[in-house]
């Protein structure tokens, strides 16, 4: 079965990700993830927990080396997705990326505001399955702490924020059109959490991917046009002030009937028990 398209970009992948079913990362020498389609600028002062993953060595300096997103859930802990740290995205093992950093407190990637904090520890969910994107989770440990005010609470199992119909916002620096136009500043798009039954109909298996409600949730705009996209992978989906999802995969960007699929944070908390 062809692998669902993640929202991270890589060399050749960066040219075709908008039309394929792949994980969401960003363009340039290696591979990276997607951006927010149909959104608007989102001042980082209002969303200080939204961070960018960076490696200038692997992705060049034009966008500060940004290739994926992440979210601060503790002063030294960043949640992102496993496919952002895979060899396909990075062009080699993550252990060989000597300049892996988290960019925090920066709206425009070309600016020098905020902080670029080296990553001192990487944990990738050992149960992650690249063929299905199940278990798409990684935890980064920072070499120095962010302020507590830059941390977002995580929605646990049973939280009302997961209810179908709930308004949510997805954040990223990824593709804003689905055709390779990357955002220079952090953006967000308003979507809604969709029923698991609708997600399962959209992704029943086969070429379009398989939706698994135990570790995934999906969200989108029923009319299409608003979604995460390439370069947004690992970025936050936030509802009622709490983190409910991480950008993971989808079919295209903003298509009617093809909602974005996210790692379910209540499941991530269990997978990463003791590491957050």
Tell me what each language-model feature is:
Residues 78, 84-86, 108-109, 129-131, ...:
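Solvent-exposed loop/turn segments at secondary-structure junctions
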Residues 47-66, 145-153, 187, 195-233, ...:
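Active-site region of chymotrypsin-like
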Residues 5, 51, 72-86, 98-101, ...:
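C-terminal subregion of chymotrypsin/trypsin-like serine protease catalytic domains
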Residues 53-56, 81, 86-127, 204:
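Conserved H-D interstitial segment of serine endopeptidase catalytic domains
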